[in-house]
Each structure stands twice: as structure tokens, then as C-alpha cells.
Amino acid sequence: MNTNTRLHHAKPFGVVVLLVVAILFSAASRAAGAPTVPDTLQQRIIVCTTCHGMHGEGTPGSGYFPRLAGKPAAYLVRQMQNFQNGLRKYAPMEYTVRQLSLAYMQEIAEYFAAQQVPYSRSPLPPVSAATLQRGEQLVSKGDPARKIPACASCHGSQLTGVQPSTPGLVGLPYDYLSAQLGSWRTHTRGTVAPDCMAVVANRLSASDITAVAAALASRQLPADTHAQAAGSVTPPLPCGVLGATGDGT
């Protein structure tokens, strides 16, 4: 699993670095005498949309750059903060957000949270029916004997997320889901303590991670893909990002 996780991060790394360098070089060229570009939010977040899509829809076929559109704004802000403070490791993102103010991160997050664009589907890996069945069990019911809660117990009954801080899982690519679960196991992704996702990920086996990622990536989208209302779920584990009340406050 550790090898796969490193590969998942290594493949897009060089591409992202080249894109960031190209964008910065282009900005310097414009400053040197090219026509002035309007200073709009859309122009300033081009470094985001280059990988995550013009409206945060993700990058179909890549498997590595997740959808941002419609995610709770507080969740998106928290992820940028985690890249800033080292709780989440991915060099291109760490570089991109390193000097952003909290107010600017909130502005970016609110922009992407407000985007409502169609979902795209990424290719699925060849997995057995038994693997998909195991994944569906973990997603919907968990594994009480191993103290593994269901994904739905935190991410909502339709896995569309819960306001204000829990992201949706539907529509995410298999490669991204697998890589993130692996990152929690290898401590390259973390968040405010107590880190409930790190606890859950470390109770999953490598085969469980394959099963969960495959089951989530193959799920049909619900009719309503909006995040559930705050307070509509009771988390089964203490989660620092959800605060004392379990709803982010």
C-alpha cells in the first residue's frame, strides 16, 4: 500500500510543477509589457483550475485531481490550512497555498462551494464482485467487529457530505480515494486532533481500501448531490474538525 501511495502522488507531481512554473512565467511576462489581464477571482485561481477544472469539476480521466465543486466551504478552507501547516503533504499544493491569507482561502473556498456542475466518471479498476460487495458493506454498514464505522455514518446517508466540514465522497475517482486512505495510514495526510479518519484508515486492511475505493467510485449519483444539513448525523468517533458538538462548532 505504501508503494502505491507514493506512486499515486508521484505521477502527477511533475506535471503540476511544470504547470505552476508556466503560470508564474506567464504572469511575469504580462507584467513586463503584455496587455493587462482583468483582476478577477477566476483569473487569480487559474493555478487551482488548471488541475481541478474551470469550475472545480475535477479532471476526468486523471484519477488524481478531485472535484472541488459543491464541497462544503469550511472543508475546503481546512484542507488549504492543512497544506500550509504540514498536516497534509503534497508539494504542489503546499507551494500553491503557502502565502494565502485566511480571508483569501475563504474567498476561494466559497467560490468552489457555490459551483454546481455535472459530475464526470473516471475509469474503474478491474475488481471482483466479492471486492465490490465487501466495499459496499464497509461503506454502508462498516465492520463492527473491527470497530470500523460505515462511511455513511459521517459522510451522510447518500455520501454527499454534511455541512459545514464533511466532504462528499460520491463522484470521486478510485485512484484519488485509494491514495487518500493510504495517505492517512502513512501519515502524509492528517487534520486537527483527534483525527478520526486516521483512526479509521489504520483499521482498514489494504484489501479493504481497494474495496472501499472501488465501491465509492462505482456508486451511482443520488438525485440530490448537495451536502446534508449540519447536525443531521452523529459521528461515531471523536473528530477534531467537527468540534465539540459534532457539527463543526
What is the predicted function of each stretch?
Residues I46-M54, I108, I148-Q158, V212:
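The canonical Cys-X-X-Cys-His
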Residues S62-R67, A73, V77-E136:
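Acidic (E/D-rich), amphipathic helical modules within compact regulatory domains
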Residues R98-S122, R134, V200-P235:
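C-terminal capping alpha-helices of c-type cytochrome domains
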